[in-house]
């Protein structure tokens, strides 16, 4: 049976709050770094559910992250304009660079020297010397935020792409603008140098990809507008194709002439980063606190191109101030080739390379005032030791030619397995954690060695649908009792269940005997079944909403919520809570005391939208009041202070309600789907209670 061309590899909860950015390791495609609103930088092994390292140090949310080419360093930029560079082997902050006025949107490491470039929403581009801890040069010229930044393969140029629709090519030696490209009609979201030729590709929110000759600075070709904005572009390592990633789609393009070789339907949403490893393209996207990783099998790609209509674009000629490009070797296409050799530096005497043994190796000087313990939380020591603490510097990171991820079988009509069959495990058990729904072969070098021999497993090719292993002690989750909110067929709801207790048994029930043929009158009664109950439900709900509205419009939100709680109608409570979620200023300690006892009931409801509303309210309360709860529980009032005693009593009530909820949430975090994701995020927030 054939295997899938593209599939979801894994989904995981990456942070305790929203994920803002992510990046895949450019060398191996087997490591991933994420940054979030929680000000943390988390490191992952692709295919595993456990976080390897959690790096802190930022004082504002992290908006951009980037690996260096060897996957030894990670740079993270924050909303406040600060960059921190982490060395992953000692897991330390080695540099803190400040200078941008606003959020840093993109960064890139120089291919040879110890330099980093950054682009910001302040429209400026800065070049940093990592050794000297300072900004070398600030490039000005963009009129909107800088979306993407790249060094050329030879390290002599820097190209920047902005929301102002322009692409600027900077000469690092001369320290000035070398060329500007203005052909896009929307913000430029992706730029990529050809690995060999003097060719630049750019993708934009105008849904096109354009190719530029870096000798003549003319437009080579442009794709036809696609269905959605271009999110990411990357050349194949041999330079034969360009892969364009957009909303749920992956396209393989050629440029002379412009043609589309193949299109993959991937389903990754708004993909954030892609990288090519072995014969596969790995893509990752994020939504709220979750990160999803997808795989496309490039060995299944068609190599027969479909020609596209060339876009009528004006040719771009070099600007008058541009200097002639030095002579370079030519590629098969006739274009000059990038020279990737590190340029020689001037020295007073020749030196033999000094190869240090591992004990002699030292990291760059660490910034003053940065404590190692504050910056690092190694959550998976086994994976960390395997990937980032090898015996030699050469094998510091997973190999580029790592074993490809096995593709699941393409079973007609089979549904994609739900993610999160296994919850995140503690670090002590990380060595035997399953990789994902499609486990990687044990021969893969990037995987940590397992502590115990793996049980005999059926080969992946004989399994009809790949599935994760389930721990023997796991009890089946009663998720089937939940009535989904996005169902596409009747759920056979009992309308009497929505009535208040006083009216619950008033509606007559008509059940025709199944042993004989129904008459017309019985069929009509069957169709009317539940109608009277529904009328009573709607009448009661309308009456109650009128009461709540009258109190609410009088300006007393707390009393109106108390009246809803006393009505014991969960549907009305959910409606009111959804309104309150839109206006966070309504929430205070008094409101928490009133609402929290009912949130546990909603949390155990059989209706999915009730559970989601309860989770959203609990998350809001925990994010805004956890520090207040912990502070008051730690320091109860000692003297006579009525206001403080009232606040302490309210915090104690809220704290006890939340602690009582924690056990139920911990039990439910193992379920799959959206509910499981909500419960896992809620569990992380509840763990912050002391």
From Swiss-Prot:
Q: Where is the composition biased (Polar residues)?
A: 304-318
Q: Which residue intervals are annotated with compositional bias (Low complexity) in the record?
A: 427-444
UniProt-annotated location(s): Cytoplasm; Cytoplasm, Cytoskeleton, Microtubule organizing center, Centrosome; Cytoplasm, Cytoskeleton, Spindle pole; Cytoplasm, Cytoskeleton
**Record-level GO cellular component terms:** centrosome; cytoplasm; katanin complex; microtubule; spindle; spindle pole
> Tell me, what is an example of a GO biological process annotation in this record?
cell division
Q: What does this protein do?
A: Participates in a complex which severs microtubules in an ATP-dependent manner. May act to target the enzymatic subunit of this complex to sites of action such as the centrosome. Microtubule severing may promote rapid reorganization of cellular microtubule arrays and the release of microtubules from the centrosome following nucleation.
Q: What is this protein called?
A: Katanin p80 WD40 repeat-containing subunit B1
Its taxonomic placement starts with: Eukaryota, Metazoa, Echinodermata, Eleutherozoa, Echinozoa
- Tell me the gene name: KATNB1
């Amino acid at each position: 049976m054939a295997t899938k061309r593209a599939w979801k590899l894994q989904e995981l909860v990456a942070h305790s709050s929203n994920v803002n950015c992510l990046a895949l390791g450019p060398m191996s495609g087997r490591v991933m770094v994420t940054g979030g609103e929680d000000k943390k930088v988390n490191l992952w092994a692709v295919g595993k559910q456990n976080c390897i390292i959690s790096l802190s140090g930022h004082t504002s949310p992290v908006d951009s992250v980037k690996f260096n080419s060897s996957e030894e360093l990670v740079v993270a930029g924050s909303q406040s304009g600060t960059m921190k560079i982490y060395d992953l082997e000692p897991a330390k902050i080695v540099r803190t660079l400040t200078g941008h006025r606003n959020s840093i949107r993109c960064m890139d490491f120089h291919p040879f020297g110890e330099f980093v470039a950054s682009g910001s929403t302040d429209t400026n581009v800065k070049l940093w010397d990592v050794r000297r801890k300072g900004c070398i040069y600030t490039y000005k010229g963009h009129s909107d935020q800088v979306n993407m930044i790249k060094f050329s393969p030879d390290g002599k140029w820097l190209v920047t792409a902005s929301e102002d629709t322009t692409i600027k090519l900077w000469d690092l030696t001369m320290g000035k603008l070398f060329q500007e490209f203005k052909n896009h009609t929307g913000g430029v979201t992706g730029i990529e140098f050809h690995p060999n030729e003097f060719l630049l590709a750019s993708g934009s929110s105008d849904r096109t990809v354009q190719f530029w000759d870096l000798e003549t600075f003319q437009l080579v070709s442009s794709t036809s507008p696609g269905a959605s904005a271009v999110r990411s572009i990357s050349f194949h390592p041999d330079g034969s194709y360009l892969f364009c990633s957009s909303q749920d789609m992956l396209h393989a393009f050629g440029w002379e002439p412009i043609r589309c070789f193949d299109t993959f339907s991937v389903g990754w949403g708004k993909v954030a980063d892609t990288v090519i490893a072995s014969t596969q393209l790995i893509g990752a996207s994020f939504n709220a606190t979750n990160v999803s990783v997808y795989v496309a099998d490039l060995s299944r790609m068609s190599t027969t191109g479909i020609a596209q209509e060339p876009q009528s674009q004006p040719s771009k000629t070099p600007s008058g101030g541009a200097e002639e490009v030095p002579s370079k070797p030519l590629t098969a296409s006739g274009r000059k080739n990038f020279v990737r050799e590190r340029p020689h530096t001037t020295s007073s005497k020749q030196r033999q390379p000094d190869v240090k043994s591992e004990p002699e190796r030292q990291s760059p000087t660490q910034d003053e005032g940065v404590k190692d313990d504050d910056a690092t939380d190694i959550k998976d020591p086994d994976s960390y030791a395997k990937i980032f603490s090898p015996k030699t510097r050469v094998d510091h990171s997973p190999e580029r030619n790592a074993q490809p991820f096995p593709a699941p079988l393409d079973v007609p009509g089979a549904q994609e397995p739900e993610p999160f069959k296994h919850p995140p495990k503690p670090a002590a058990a990380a060595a035997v954690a399953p990789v994902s729904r499609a486990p990687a072969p044990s021969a893969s070098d990037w995987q940590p060695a397992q502590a115990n021999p793996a049980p005999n497993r059926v080969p992946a090719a004989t399994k009809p649908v790949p599935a994760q292993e389930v721990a023997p002690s796991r009890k089946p989750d009663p998720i089937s009792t939940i009535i989904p909110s996005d169902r596409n067929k009747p759920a056979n709801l009992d309308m009497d269940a929505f009535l208040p207790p006083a009216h619950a048994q008033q509606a007559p029930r008509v059940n025709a005997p199944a042993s004989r043929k129904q008459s017309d009158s019985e069929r009509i009664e069957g169709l009317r079944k539940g109608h009277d109950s529904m009328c009573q439900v709607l009448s009661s709900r309308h009456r109650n909403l009128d009461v709540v509205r009258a109190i609410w419009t009088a300006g007393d939100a707390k009393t109106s919520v108390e009246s809803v709680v006393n009505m014991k109608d969960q549907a009305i409570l959910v409606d009111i809570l959804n309104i309150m979620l839109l206006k966070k200023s309504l929430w205070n300690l008094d409101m928490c005391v009133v609402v929290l006892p009912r949130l546990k009931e909603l949390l155990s409801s059989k209706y999915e939208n009730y559970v989601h509303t309860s989770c959203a309210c609990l998350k809001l309360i925990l994010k805004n009041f956890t520090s207040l709860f912990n502070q008051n529980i730690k320091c109860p009032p000692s003297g006579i202070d009525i206001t403080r005693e009232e606040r302490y009593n309210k915090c104690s009530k809220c704290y006890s309600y939340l602690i009582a909820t924690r056990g139920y949430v911990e039990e439910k975090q193992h379920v799959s789907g959206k509910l499981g994701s909500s419960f896992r995020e809620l569990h992380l927030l509840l763990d912050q209670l002391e």
